[in-house]
Amino acid sequence: MNYFDLFNVVPAFDIDTALLAERYRELQRAVHPDKFANDTEQQKLLSVQRTAQVNDGYQTLKNPLRRAEHMLSLRGIELSHETTTLKDGAFLMQQMEWREALEDIQHNSDPQSSIDELYESFGEFESTLLTKLATLLISDESADALLAADQIRKLKFMAKLHDELARIEDGLLD
């Protein structure tokens, strides 16, 4: 299903999230199961299914990473259940450095400073990835779509690093 069509928004990486939220509320009002409480079982079931589609579409489009994946899936590139390994040597080296830094946090004399530095480093890197991704998603070239897929893979890795750093930070606060 094309969620951009469902929400009647222009297919783009940078979307108007306020407009998306407005369309979400409109669609929810139109298909909400309570509206069909006195209808046939088939209509009730259809309403539940449509509500699920609207909810899934909204969650997909409001999240930049999921939105980018959806854009690629509309072009025939599925990333949701893949196990493709990145072949970017520089990124792999950076991953190793970040992993080592995460492991060293608990042994640092000022762990919060290390955490703050990593958040900043992650943020800068993610910003660069998102800028590249936005540019690649504009292109109609299939090679650019494959490069966009690599950017998404990197961003997924960064999300995992963020989660791990947050867990470490929470553990230090306990």
Swiss-Prot record:
Name a biological process GO annotation: [2Fe-2S] cluster assembly
Question: Is Chaperone among the key words of this record?
Answer: yes
Q: Which UniProt keywords apply?
A: Chaperone
Explain the purpose of this protein: Co-chaperone involved in the maturation of iron-sulfur cluster-containing proteins. Seems to help targeting proteins to be folded toward HscA.
**Mind telling me which NCBIfam families this protein's record contains?**
hscB, PRK05014.1
Q: Which family does it belong to?
A: Belongs to the HscB family.
- Annotated protein name in UniProt: Co-chaperone protein HscB homolog
Identify the gene encoding this protein: hscB
